């Protein structure tokens, strides 16, 4: 009985059939039949259960397949509205809400039913769906691990191929003479039908331990040559060397795939880190797929600049503080029915603090601050600009209330209808989208827009109208009080000499730097620190600041530039002519220092202290022209010739003459009219006046310059001795200050102001007015309260 069961066991899946054969009459003895019947019933029951289980699996798979909607008809079964599975138990319909996530996970994982996303919209988490939407489903960490493991794999492959024992190559003749004829060959292995590896008889391996191999042209030729050779050597029967054919991987397949892998890796890296996606984290994968996304940065508590670090533009600062106060305390304005202005545009010359004021706004506002440059909207692809504008304002609405700052908005906000030559301009499309987003049907709420530009004259009028930019804030160069306040800000971190007081030093430096912008003031303070460090000084003294001012005004001092004695003498008399002419002209600027040491592009240098004023008379402009012509006149008087050194002087005189006649209406023949002079770099296609008027203007300019030149000749001819004394002392000392001029020429015959107190006399106070209106005195109070509140109360509010 046992051996029969064992035979049946060996038949595998034929147990039932074998038992049936044994149960027929005569198959087994009568005593064995009851046991076999019991075994038969057990086996058939198990087989039937196995068949039922297989049938159940097939039916379940079929139901899962049929539960999915046909391809292309997914939209007709949104969100599982095609009903539940028929095979789903009723208890699932009555499950509590807490068990729904698990049921959803099971249905989506198994692909059944219409309750999951498979019955409707495609799962957004699927990697291919994310890839099509421009979002690679691997973050930077996964990418780094992927490249690391790939590099390790290919490095291991290369290491294996380099260190793999390559054996020793021999020729057919060496194989015959040294191995086959001596009977040390056990067998020959034909590898990949390319070469033959020789396997030696045990105990007869070469001393170096390397196997030997030789190349073959073709397998048929090798077999014929081997058979012929063995016959010649008398090797017959079982003594003949067996030939084995094997296939091995020598790494050539992997090496052939390496270029493909490198190309794929490069494409993935390019897609993820394309030109439009560099530095963009968390918003798509960058590159070509996200070229329409905005490149704006959202700043939250990342700026260290505060309003206390901004000086010299108090009026503009108050305007911006009001925006911040509205976002922090809107009830103060809403109770009166006021609406927050949509935006403000900051205009003014370069370096006056427009971007710095925006940074201070970002540092003080307790709301998100979004910054973007106007040039970032325009790319080489058509339609990118409007798409980025839409994405930018969508980002702003998402973070509302917030402040949006567009720097250099003139790059995208230029007037429409210029320079397109009949073609559609991408810049115009971007501007149109910007206008719609700022004040159209899709207006923003609680989003304040700030913008900065140096050229408000070229902006489109539709961009500047109320409702888009309600306020235009002009930030001009600071006056003497503003410069003193700016100096106080930039003197804080500097290590000054113990004899210097910051307030007095700031006022003195402000009086020495008329016309300086905030950026120039910051540059002066930094240059003074660099000069002190260059001389290994322990602190910064007043002399360092004076040298820094000269460095900013005149440029780098070139002590190593060698001038010929004749050239040096010409430069000395040229600068002496400027100094003496200005000394004896009432409306000329007071002289501070004159030098014949080359600075910047010039061979000489004169520093004046111009009076800060906003209105100029005709006599004042004429005196300035005469002082500027003093160098050329001095050359002609003392040398009887003129040089090219007066080129810059003549340019300034010509500009002043044209401005008086064309812009200011200071000529009787041309009349009381004003035309705009073209800016440097502007394209002038036609003049706004006739040819006859242009000829008249040119004639009057020439007459005005000639009159100024004759007046200067008469003045310096009268003061010829003074010019010579100043020139000789310049040749001796190279640098003269105001005290030297007083010693040579006596006190200046006209009253002049030189100290800070004299300049601010009659203006009300010595310092800039930094007081706040009543409504803005507690503008930062809400933020301080939030800081004092414990975390639990803050969350509760």
From Swiss-Prot:
One of its GO terms (biological process) is cristae formation. It is found in: Mitochondrion inner membrane. One of its GO terms (cellular component) is mitochondrial inner membrane. It is an enzyme of class 3 (hydrolase). Residues 39-66 form a propeptide. Changing residue 575 to Q: Abolished protease activity. Loss of autocatalytic processing. Impaired proteolytic maturation of SPG7. The chain crosses the membrane at residues 143-163, 251-271. Changing residue 376 to K: In OPA12; uncertain significance. Its cofactor is Zn(2+). The active site is at 575. Signal peptide: none annotated. Residues 39-142, 272-797 are mitochondrial matrix. Pfam families: AAA, AAA_lid_3, FtsH_ext, Peptidase_M41. Changing residue 346 to F: In OPA12; uncertain significance. Residues 108-117 have a biased composition (Gly residues). It is a multi-pass membrane protein. NCBIfam families: FtsH_fam. Homohexamer. Forms heterohexamers with SPG7. The m-AAA protease is either composed of homohexamers of AFG3L2 or heterohexamers of AFG3L2 and SPG7. Interacts with MAIP1. Interacts with DNAJC19. Interacts with PHB2. In the N-terminal section; belongs to the AAA ATPase family. In the C-terminal section; belongs to the peptidase M41 family. Catalytic component of the m-AAA protease, a protease that plays a key role in proteostasis of inner mitochondrial membrane proteins, and which is essential for axonal and neuron development. AFG3L2 possesses both ATPase and protease activities: the ATPase activity is required to unfold substrates, threading them into the internal proteolytic cavity for hydrolysis into small peptide fragments. The m-AAA protease carries out quality control in the inner membrane of the mitochondria by mediating degradation of mistranslated or misfolded polypeptides. This is Mitochondrial inner membrane m-AAA protease component AFG3L2. The lineage of its organism: Eukaryota, Metazoa, Chordata, Craniata, Vertebrata.
């Amino acid at each position: 009985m046992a051996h029969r069961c064992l035979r049946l066991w060996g038949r595998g899946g034929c147990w039932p059939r074998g038992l049936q054969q044994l149960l027929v009459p005569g198959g087994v003895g009568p005593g064995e039949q009851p046991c076999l019947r019991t075994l038969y019933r057990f086996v058939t029951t198990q087989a039937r259960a196995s068949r039922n289980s297989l049938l159940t699996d097939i039916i379940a798979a079929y139901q899962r397949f049929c539960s999915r909607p046909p391809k292309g008809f997914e939209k007709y079964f949104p969100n599982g509205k095609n009903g539940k599975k028929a095979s789903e138990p009723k208890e699932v319909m009555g499950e509590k809400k807490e068990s729904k996530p698990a049921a959803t996970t099971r249905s989506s994982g198994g692909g059944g039913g219409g309750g999951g996303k498979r019955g409707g919209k495609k799962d957004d988490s699927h990697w291919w769906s994310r890839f099509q939407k421009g979002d690679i489903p691997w973050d930077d960490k996964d990418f780094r691990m992927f490249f690391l493991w790939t590099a390790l794999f290919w490095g291991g492959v290369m290491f294996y191929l380099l260190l793999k024992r390559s054996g020793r190559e021999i020729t057919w003749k060496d194989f015959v003479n040294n191995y086959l004829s001596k009977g040390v060959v056990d067998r020959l292995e034909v590898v990949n039908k390319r070469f033959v590896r020789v396997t030696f008889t045990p105990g007869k391996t070469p001393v170096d331990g390397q196997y030997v191999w030789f190349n073959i042209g073709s397998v048929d030729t090798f077999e014929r040559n081997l058979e012929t050779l063995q016959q010649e050597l008398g090797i017959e029967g079982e003594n003949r060397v067996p030939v084995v054919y094997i296939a091995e991987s020598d790494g050539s397949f992997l090496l052939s795939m390496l270029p493909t892998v490198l190309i794929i890796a490069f494409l993935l890296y390019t897609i993820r880190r394309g030109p439009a996606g560099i530095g963009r984290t968390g918003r798509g994968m960058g590159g070509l797929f996200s070229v329409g996304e905005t490149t704006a940065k959202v700043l939250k508590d990342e700026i260290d600049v505060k309003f206390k670090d901004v000086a010299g533009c108090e009026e503009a600062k108050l305007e911006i503080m009001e925006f911040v106060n509205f976002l922090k305390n809107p009830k103060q304005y809403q109770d009166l029915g006021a609406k927050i202005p949509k935006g403000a545009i900051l205009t003014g010359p370069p370096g006056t603090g427009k971007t710095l004021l925006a940074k201070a706004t970002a540092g003080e506002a307790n709301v998100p601050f979004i910054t973007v440059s106007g040039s970032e909207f325009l790319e080489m692809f058509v339609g990118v600009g409007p798409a980025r504008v839409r994405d930018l304002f969508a980002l702003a609405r998402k973070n509302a209330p917030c402040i949006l700052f567009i720097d250099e908005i003139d790059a995208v906000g230029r007037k429409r209808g210029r320079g397109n030559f009949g073609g559609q301009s991408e810049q115009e499309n971007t501007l149109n989208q910007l206008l719609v987003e700022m004040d159209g049907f899709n207006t923003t709420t609680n989003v304040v827009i700030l913008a900065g530009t140096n050229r408000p004259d070229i902006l489109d009028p539709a961009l500047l109208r109320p409702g888009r930019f309600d306020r235009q804030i002009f930030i001009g160069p600071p006056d003497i009080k503003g410069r003193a306040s700016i100096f106080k800000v930039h003197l804080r971190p500097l290590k000054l000499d113990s004899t210097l007081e910051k307030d007095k030093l700031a006022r003195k430096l402000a009086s020495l730097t008329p016309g300086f912008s905030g950026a120039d003031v910051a540059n002066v303070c930094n240059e003074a620190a660099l000069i002190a460090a260059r001389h290994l000084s322990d602190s910064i003294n007043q002399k360092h600041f004076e040298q820094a001012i000269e460095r900013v005004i005149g440029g780098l001092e070139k002590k190593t530039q060698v001038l010929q004695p004749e050239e040096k003498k010409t430069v000395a008399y040229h600068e002496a002519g400027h100094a003496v002419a200005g000394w004896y002209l009432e409306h000329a600027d007071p002289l501070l220092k004159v030098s014949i040491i080359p600075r910047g592009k010039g061979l000489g240098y004169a520093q004046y202290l111009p009076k800060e004023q906003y209105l100029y008379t005709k006599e004042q402009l004429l005196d300035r022209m005469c002082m500027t012509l003093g160098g050329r006149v001095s050359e002609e008087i003392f040398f009887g010739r003129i040089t090219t050194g007066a080129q810059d002087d003549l340019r300034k005189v010509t500009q002043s003459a044209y401005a008086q006649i064309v812009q200011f209406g200071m000529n009787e023949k041309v009349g009381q009219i004003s035309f705009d002079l073209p800016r440097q770099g502007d394209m002038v296609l036609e003049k706004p006046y006739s040819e006859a008027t242009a000829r008249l203007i040119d004639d009057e300019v020439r007459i005005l310059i000639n009159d100024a030149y004759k007046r200067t000749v008469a003045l310096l001819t009268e003061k010829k001795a003074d010019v010579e004394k100043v020139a000789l002392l310049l040749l001796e000392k190279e640098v003269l200050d105001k005290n030297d001029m007083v010693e040579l020429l006596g006190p200046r015959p006209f009253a002049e102001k030189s100290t800070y107190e004299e300049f601010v006399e009659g203006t009300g106070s010595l310092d800039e007015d930094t007081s706040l209106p009543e409504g803005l005195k507690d503008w930062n109070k809400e933020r301080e309260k939030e800081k004092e509140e414990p975390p639990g109360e803050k969350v509760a509010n």
